[in-house]
UniProtKB/Swiss-Prot annotation:
Biological process, per Gene Ontology: translation
GO molecular function, a single term: rRNA binding
One Pfam family in the UniProt entry: Ribosomal_S3_C
Keywords: Ribonucleoprotein, Ribosomal protein, RNA-binding, rRNA-binding
Gene: rpsC
Record's subunit section: Part of the 30S ribosomal subunit. Forms a tight complex with proteins S10 and S14.
GO cellular component: cytosolic small ribosomal subunit
Residues of the KH type-2 domain: 38-106
Name of the protein in its database record: Small ribosomal subunit protein uS3
Amino acid sequence: MGQKVNPIGLRIGIIRDWESRWYAEKDYADLLHEDLKIREYLTKRLSDAAVSRIEIERAANRVNITIHTAKPGMVIGKGGSEVEALRKALNELTGKRVHINIVEIKKPDLEAKLVAENIARQIENRVSFRRAQKQAIQRTMRAGAKGIKTMVSGRLGGADIARSEHYSEGTVPLHTLRADIDYATAEADTTYGKIGVKVWIYRGEVLPTKKKTEEGGN
């Protein structure tokens, strides 16, 4: 079933960690909805800032947000003006003290989210879906990936019947749990309707750290 399941969810607790890290009992549902609002707001506001991942941590009445972006300058703004405006807006949205960390992505071509969004934007700009996929694959392999698979689905080229087409290069071992596979989806809004984009990137193997347990007497 490795072909069907989300590769990131399958690896949580093995080589991946949760993107929201906090504990709650009776307030769990409210905090979960708050997380969704924060992610929705940041995704919309930073749509041009090449944001790959948003991590949320909570402690008492404080929210720590880590934004992974390929364009940190756009998120921070001139003299930190943009990130300060962002913090104030999130303070109002959540009613809590918000602290924002910015992490720069050194190799954006190895981030599935950014590759998928790039393919989607090209399709919206009437670039051939085949060309968009092949160019993305070449860039990702040049950046040092071990393998990549891309898939687009919908009314490709304005066809009457929706279909899917995928391209791949290298290996993408979905069943190997120690394989570091990044996966993401994106949507392209065209005059013929939405076209879905999926990207899997294999970045090499990660050996999970084993917790050493000391046995009494040894």
